[in-house]
Amino acid sequence: MTDNLVIYHLHSDNSLLDSCTGYKLYIDRAAELGQPAIAFSEHGKPLNWVKKKMYCDEKGIKYIHGVEIYLTESLNEKVRDNYHTVLIARNEQGVKELNLAVSKSCDKDHFYYVNRLSFDEFLKLSNNIITTSACLASPLNKLPVDHPMYESLVKRYDFLEIQSHDCQEQRDFNVHLAELAKKYSKPLIAGTDTHSLDKYKAECRKILLKYKNKSYGDEDTYDLTYKSREELDAAFARQGVLPPELYRQAMDNTLVMADMVEPFELDASIKYPILYGSSEEDSRIETERVDRMFKEKLEAGIIPPEQEKGFRSALTEERRVFEKLGMSGFMLCMSELICWCKENNIPIGPGRGSVGGSRTAFVTDIIECNPEQWHTVFSRFCNEDRKEIGD
């Protein structure tokens, strides 16, 4: 079964406590409907995007990287205008640019209740970012049409987003967007502003909003559940303000937008630091460091003579594993960092987690607990078959 629709304006429980639906439930539903792609537009930040992409890949659905960003007229004035706009990465470079823009929006001079970009910063985004005008909190709805930035904003949007909510403000905005689309030759696109998987999850969200003491005006008249093409078509028909050929073309344009997005591969491999130019050089320096500090601890009696043999055997094996996994630079980095902290009177803890099984970590002052004394196990921290980074 194939459903000719892509849901791209979508909020999971990552969206500032504004949803009770986990991202996997949405992706499962998209796969069930046969929808070819899905995008998440979480409020302000593309949280958990790596996990979302990996799960989309697992389900055979195209992942589209997006966010619903907050815009402000000026960063100089502390005003909670917080206009909404959806950003979608067109390609891998767009993913990096989108993430960088979100990071910038979190800077101290940008943040005011929420992370924000200025209108000027938004307009300077490259064509690697696809933009839609978002919901009723869009600047195209909240600003007067004679605002000096209004026309520039309209021209920057790649798509003007109509939605099917059955309230007068949305009806009026849809008509206005259709007029703007005609005037500026901009395509309409059908957004859903999905916040819940189904009616049950929508009720859960109502309870959550009550708990937060939040109310969003006419939202009781909205249906923010996940839609199939047939369901969204029926919702626009009930709304009754746009001709069918217009809103159906807007639904088709969700597929057009998805086709504009280039798929990209995610390198989820573990990446350890290289401190001195190459893994081989890091390994050589780490070996010298371990040998020197081991000798110092033996001479100081920190490592008792009866433990020397066990330590030597363990250090040799750990060195082999670290070199095979490319971890020498990581261990060297941690040792140098912690020793520097101690030399500069910066408090650190005695160590935690499975690293307590590493004799190398003890010898190089990463931890203070002697693994040989307490018979802790190195393989719990690191072994050739472990896929995750040890803690």
Placement of each model-derived feature along the sequence:
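Domain-core and long-helix interface of multi-subunit machines
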Residues: 1-40, 44-59, 100-199, 245-247, ...
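Non-catalytic structural connector segments
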Residues: 1-6, 242-354, 362-367
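Hydrophobic or amphipathic alpha-helical targeting/insertion segments
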Residues: 45-111
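Histidine/acidic-residue-rich catalytic or RNA/ligand-binding cores of hydrolases
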Residues: 171-174, 198-209, 361-362
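Conserved, well-ordered active-site substructure
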Residues: 203-216, 367-368
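Enzymes and membrane/adaptor proteins characterized by extended Gly/Ser/Thr/Asp/Glu-rich
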Residues: 210-211, 218-242
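A structural-propensity feature for long, helix-poor, extended segments
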Residues: 232, 236, 240, 382-391
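Class I SAM-dependent methyltransferase SAM-binding "motif I" and its flanking Rossmann-like core
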Residues: 361-389
